Amino acid sequence: MSRTATAAGPSTSAPNDGSRTITITNVPTNEGGDDIIPEEDGPVGTLRLRAARTRTGPRVTWDEDVVDNEHAGKKKSKICCIFRPTRDFGESSSSDSDSDSSCDHDHDREEGPSGEGSSSNRPRQGPMQIHDCCDSDDDKNAYERLPSYQRKKIKAKRRAGRFSSLYESQDAHTL
């Protein structure tokens, strides 16, 4: 006795709706005997497969402060590969000893006997002088700073709030 499988729709590809019905039927064969036992015509069994239901629960939503990396419409909640260990006051870090390209003066400059600075490649002797011009208020790197278009929006909101408070105070004085 052999079995054949038939499927609703094309049998070479998966259906697009996620469900498929398979019907298995028995086909009698004559294998040498005249004793053919008649079998019922029709399906022996039906197997119906259905795709699992999709979740209808809450989905991810992004706050306004989430960064849109590279203006590509993709928002990220994490910033990769940035680690800033906590330091005690006065403790130096390896980034402090590196030269800072944002300063306009030479950190390696030492006062010579004639009062002129020399920028030779000799090792430093004594403590390094800290310059106030290099201390920035925001110690954020490029990944931690807001993109320029977001900074402009924030500044515009602040200005609008400042101007509205000025108008309100002028209206109060004129009444």
Curated annotation (Swiss-Prot):
Residues 102-112 have a biased composition (Basic and acidic residues). GO terms for molecular function: protein phosphatase 1 binding; protein serine/threonine phosphatase inhibitor activity. The keyword Nucleus applies. It is found in: Nucleus. Residues 1-15 have a biased composition (Low complexity). Residues 150-161 have a biased composition (Basic residues). Keywords: Nucleus. GO terms for cellular component: nucleus. Its main location: nucleus. It comes from the Eukaryota. Residues 16-29 have a biased composition (Polar residues). Residues 1-74, 88-175 are annotated as: Disordered. Transmembrane segments: none annotated. Pfam families: PPI_Ypi1. Residues 32-42 have a biased composition (Acidic residues). Belongs to the YPI1 family. Regulator of type 1 phosphatases which maintains protein phosphatase activity under strict control. This is Type 1 phosphatases regulator YPI1. The gene is YPI1.
